[in-house]
Amino acid sequence: MGVSGSGKSTLAEGLSAALGLPMKDGDELHLPESVAKMSAGIALEDADRWPWLDRIANYLANSEQNPQGKSGAIVACSALKLIYRDRIRQQAGPVVFLFLDGQPDLIKQRMQGRKGHYMQAGLLDSQLQTLEKPGADERDIIALSINQSVSNLLQNAIVKLVAYQEDSLSHDGSLVQAPSLNKH
């Protein structure tokens, strides 16, 4: 999760390959009219996001076990507000959000270097204003700084996910509502 240009899709692709889990870019789940708005430089409103969040949650809730016996899926999506994350949690079940945090100047630079993406760099300010950074009460969120190489970011994400899962185990070794590595 994070604003556009923070590296969500790149990290999700790397995690998918490393963990053997299916990955979906949340951009693919937007309704056509929402894509048209963003392409025109118009920020989305909550009403535009509800169907998109429902599609994300549905994808996660219906992820199946892969041939290696792992269940879960990875979705790259912004999930900027607590209410958006709560909607995904309520519909998809236990999830882990990876919050990609970085300086606006770095993110804007990345966005300006992208080719063929409908999200314009001019919408970054709107996303930063909308962003509700996760609080300490959101225990299913792992914060990661984007001020590092992609390979280091991927390695740090995996290390923190493993630690998160280990922390989710009860003392007798049984899983206590630990996610099946559903990542956003």
Where are these regions (language model features)?
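Conserved lysine of the Walker
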Residues: 8
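Conserved phosphate-donor/acceptor-positioning beta-strand/loop module used by diverse small-molecule
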Residues: 91-111, 144
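C-terminal accessory "lid"/substrate-recognition subdomains
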Residues: 162-184
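P-loop (Walker A) phosphate-binding loop of NTP-binding proteins
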Residues: 3
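Conserved substrate/cofactor phosphate-moiety recognition/catalytic segment
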Residues: 13-58
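Small-molecule kinase domains that catalyze NTP-dependent phosphoryl transfer to phosphate-bearing small molecules
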Residues: 113-156, 165
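Glycine-rich phosphate-binding loop used to anchor ATP phosphates in small-molecule kinases
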Residues: 47-94, 100
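Conserved nucleotide-binding/hydrolysis micro-motifs of P-loop NTPases
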Residues: 29-30, 79-81, 102-106, 149
